UniProtKB/Swiss-Prot annotation:
Interacts with MinD and FtsZ. It comes from Beijerinckia indica subsp. indica (strain ATCC 9039 / DSM 1715 / NCIMB 8712). It comes from the Bacteria. Keywords: Cell cycle, Cell division, Septation. This is Probable septum site-determining protein MinC.
Length: 244
């Protein structure tokens, strides 16, 4: 005798890996936060809506000190989704989970040293889990303008924008960035190497960065504004030339 059994959709658990920004504070922590505040002033929306992992392996913190540190980030609108390098015994629902097995993908140094003038380095990392498998290292083509508040991240290659990038928007690329319109937002290229370049048809950028070295709008020569330019890294300085 054959019995009919009602079939149900299977319950499946699937793994996913996602890119996340990793911040690694260094001592003295107060000075580190001062640098972070300066970065946020230059790029107010940089951390908005972006998950961040906090690496505390460089610090020796008690549980209460770690809670105070997390509060500092919360006060700045930075959402900490996980901890790395923390030794938390027991389970604390008020703490982000401790993450292990992350693979460093690249380093972007956020903070300029005292000797830097037009460019500097920032101390943060973009990290992905070991399970992430890049099928092909190709370019990402964006055929519409990038609006204010949008953030495009493509760490596997170049990013090509057919339109413009508005003020308050940002493009983060593992390779080069090509913008066939006005660049009024932030362009962060070279997450996977210093040979990357940034090209745009109309240069009005809030911030430029290649391999972690950056320049802000207040350091740009006035004669470059509104012109088609190419940006590249030479030594530890960003170079900008007009492309007529």
């Amino acid at each position: 005798m054959t019995a009919a059994v009602r079939s149900r959709p299977s319950l499946r658990f699937r793994g996913r890996s996602f890119h996340a920004m990793v911040l690694a504070p260094e001592v003295p922590v107060a000075a580190w936060f001062t640098d972070l505040d300066e970065w946020i002033q230059r790029s107010p929306g940089f951390f908005q809506g972006r998950p961040v992992v906090l690496d505390v392996s460089n610090l020796s913190l008690s549980r209460s000190a770690l809670a105070d540190l997390l509060q500092e980030f919360s006060a700045r609108g930075i959402r900490i989704m996980g901890l790395e390098g923390a030794d938390l015994s027991g389970h604390d629902l008020q703490m982000p989970p401790v993450l292990r097995g992350g693979r460093r993908e690249n380093v972007i140094d956020l903070f300029a040293g005292e000797e830097a003038q037009a460019s500097g380095k920032i101390n943060s990392q973009i990290q992905e889990g070991d399970a992430h498998d890049v099928e092909s290292a190709g370019a990402l083509l964006i055929e519409t303008p990038v609006r204010s508040g949008q953030s495009i991240m493509h760490l596997e290659g170049d990013v090509i924008v057919v339109g413009s990038v508005a003020s308050g928007a940002e493009i983060i690329a593992g390779g080069s960035i090509h913008i066939y319109g006005a660049l009024r937002g932030r362009a962060i290229a070279g997450a996977q190497g210093r040979k990357a370049r940034i090209f745009c048809r109309k240069f009005e950028a809030e911030l430029l960065s290649i391999d972690g070295y950056y320049m802000t709008a207040d350091t740009v020569e006035p004669h470059l504004l509104g012109r088609p330019v190419q940006v590249w890294l030479e030594g530890d300085r960003l170079m900008v030339s007009i492309q007529d």
